[in-house]
Amino acid sequence: MHRSTILYALSAIVSLAYAGDFSKSCSSISFRSTSISASCDDKFGDSAGTNIDLTRCLANVGGRLVCRPSNPSFKFCDCGLAGDRSVLNCRCTDSTGTKKPTSIDLDSCLTNDGGDLAC
């Protein structure tokens, strides 16, 4: 029983290490259409390919991108990753139809959940 308690505590620590800041434990980060792909470390120290559709995580609010996992609406934006691969630079349409420049640090929206990208 003592051994299982230690294993549980260690897995909790590993989970906390991946909370937010996905780019610290993921590499080969790329963006295509509305998805981020990366190779992320899992809780065993192995690395595996994963991806996430940002329409589940981001919203275009008046031409500005925000993290919004509860009610996402990542529409009407043309985007690309910045040089550090964790910032998404976009031009998003506001309510008047005007394209506005906006960017968001994906480390504030995405997390590495045991090798899988999550909002």
Language-model segments: residues:
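Fungal secretory targeting signals
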Residues: 1-19
